[in-house]
């Protein structure tokens, strides 16, 4: 009887498992051999890093895959990846071939420029498919001892440097497009006063303002409060050309004025948009020349399109102002407030405090211009009007609290009209009125709104003002000017 075959003790089932596995050839074993990959140290110790070899020309040392030791980066066309994870030089990618080679069980690739990228123009006049391609060309140029090219602009060399229309800079720089369209029609106003002395007379600059062109033959809209009687008005265009201007129409209730210059050629004009279509939250741009700095631009959003005059304390006013947080400074008055289409939707008028500014809606400007043209057609002369020379606000509770916060010595009053600004060279300045005064009464009658002041000016040739200034109580006499 044949004895059963005995398997050696200790082999257990491993022999059977080995017998079930196919026997690989020697070549296959070598190709599938797993090379050990060094582990990254728990803590980086640069003192234990191997010496850095001399890197090839055009490449710089980079950190290894562990982020600890410096190694030579692979240049374009050199191998990358592998068991040690050799990195490519900055700007290059490790591109794996369709049939990747394996080293130590890890794929090997070749460093190269990424396929996608914006074209750039080099100083050598050549267009490169990407900034990476230009740098790669520079590395090759250094090896040849040639002069490397410098990137001079984005886009092709034939482009004027604006770049691709899809770039974020062009896509979202909508305000720059508005300014480019509007700025040529915004003008700077310089107002002069004639000072007479025994030695002669001279024109002294007293204030500056802004305006915008509404007709090709030189009609310009600005604020009424920036104009004073017997002043010379000089208008400077964006090109730097200067003209003398004459006043054509003034409406102090609307705070609008129309002046005229005689240009040598047609001027660029701004179109009036419909302020009634404006929505709260829209972007707006304010242009002007505050502090005589031409082409000053601020941007903001519309807080409300109908800040009623009655809400501001103007009980007899039917004006609805545009409130915005676009900055309006001294000298910015009279400049346009435009929407993103470049249409005028208001005229910059007043800044109450930081982040709160007001503009007269363009629908009122359109009405003002229509009435002027109607008078021109009928041949009516411009009537004479009285002018005090103030920018004022009703002293509401909110304004009183804000002024108390800014100036602890602000007068302790319950009502009145706040003098925001005294225009230089006017009757108001001659009377002794100053900025931040509070007019309490005129000719013995209390005033609480700007309309009260306007009606008093119309009805009287001489005004006796009861004024509070800090802790002082003053009585000032003023005679309004007569202007055309």
Curated annotation (Swiss-Prot):
User: Would you identify the family this protein belongs to, as annotated?
Assistant: Belongs to the peptidase S1C family.
Location within or outside the cell: Secreted
Q: Which residues act catalytically here?
A: 225 (charge relay system), 255 (charge relay system), 333 (charge relay system)
What biological function has been recorded for the protein in this entry?
Answer: Serine protease.
Q: Which organism is it from?
A: Bos taurus
Q: Which SMART domains match?
A: IB, KAZAL, PDZ
Where in the numbering of this chain does the Kazal-like domain appear? 105-159
Q: Which UniProt keywords apply?
A: Disulfide bond, Hydrolase, Protease, Secreted, Serine protease, Signal
Which cysteine pairs make disulfide bonds?
40-66, 44-68, 49-69, 55-72, 80-94, 88-111, 113-132, 121-157
Boundaries of each IGFBP N-terminal domain copy? 36-114
Name the record gives this protein: Serine protease HTR4
The domain of life is: Eukaryota
Q: Which InterPro entries match?
A: Growth_fac_rcpt_cys_sf, IGFBP-like, Kazal_dom, Kazal_dom_sf, PDZ, PDZ_6, PDZ_sf, Peptidase_S1_PA
- Enzyme Commission number(s) of this protein: 3.4.21.-
State the residue spans of region: Serine protease.
209-369
């Amino acid at each position: 009887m044949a004895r059963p075959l005995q398997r050696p003790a200790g082999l257990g089932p491993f022999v059977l498992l080995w017998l079930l596995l196919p026997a690989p050839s020697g070549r296959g074993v070598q190709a599938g051999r797993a090379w050990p990959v060094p582990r990254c140290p728990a803590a980086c110790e640069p003192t234990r890093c191997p010496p850095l070899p001399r890197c090839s020309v055009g490449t710089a040392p980079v950190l290894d895959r562990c982020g600890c030791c410096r190694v030579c980066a692979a240049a374009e066309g050199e191998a990358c990846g592998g068991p040690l994870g050799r990195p490519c030089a900055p700007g290059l990618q490790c591109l794996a071939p369709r049939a990747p080679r394996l080293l130590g069980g890890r794929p090997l690739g070749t460093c190269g420029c990424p396929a996608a990228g914006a074209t750039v123009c080099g100083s050598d006049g050549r267009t490169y498919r990407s900034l990476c391609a230009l740098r790669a060309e520079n590395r090759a140029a250094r090896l040849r001892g040639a002069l490397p090219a410098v990137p001079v602009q984005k886009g092709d060399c034939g482009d004027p440097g604006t770049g691709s229309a899809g770039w974020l800079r062009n896509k979202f720089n909508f305000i720059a497009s508005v300014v480019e369209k509007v700025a040529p029609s915004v003008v700077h106003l310089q107002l002069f006063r004639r000072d007479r002395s025994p030695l002669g007379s001279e024109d002294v600059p007293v204030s500056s303002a802004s305006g915008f062109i509404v007709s090709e033959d030189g009609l310009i809209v600005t604020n009424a409060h920036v104009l004073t009687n017997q002043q010379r008005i000089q208008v400077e265009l964006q090109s730097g050309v200067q003209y003398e201007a004459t006043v054509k129409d003034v409406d102090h209730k609307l705070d609008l004025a129309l002046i005229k210059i005689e240009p040598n050629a047609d001027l660029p004009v701004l179109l009036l948009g419909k302020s009634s279509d404006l929505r709260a939250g829209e972007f707006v741009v304010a242009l002007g020349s505050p502090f005589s700095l031409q082409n000053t631009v601020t941007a903001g959003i519309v807080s409300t399109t109908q800040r009623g005059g009655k809400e501001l304390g103007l009980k007899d006013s039917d004006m609805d102002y545009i409130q915005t947080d676009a900055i309006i400074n001294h000298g910015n008055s009279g400049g346009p407030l435009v929407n993103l289409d470049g249409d005028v939707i208001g005229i910059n008028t007043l800044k109450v405090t930081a982040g709160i500014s007001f503009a007269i809606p363009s629908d009122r400007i359109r009405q003002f211009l229509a009435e002027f043209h109607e008078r021109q057609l009928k041949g009516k002369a411009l009537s004479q009007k009285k002018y005090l020379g103030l920018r004022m606000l009703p002293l509401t509770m909110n304004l009183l609290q804000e002024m108390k916060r800014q100036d602890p010595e602000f007068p302790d009053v319950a009502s009145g009209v706040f003098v925001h600004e005294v225009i230089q060279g006017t009757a108001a300045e001659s009377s002794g009125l100053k900025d931040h005064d509070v007019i309490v009464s005129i000719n013995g009658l209390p005033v609480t709104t700007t309309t009260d002041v306007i009606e008093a000016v119309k009805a009287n040739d001489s005004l006796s003002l009861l004024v509070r200034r800090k802790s002082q109580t003053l009585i000032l006499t003023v005679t309004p000017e007569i202007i055309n």
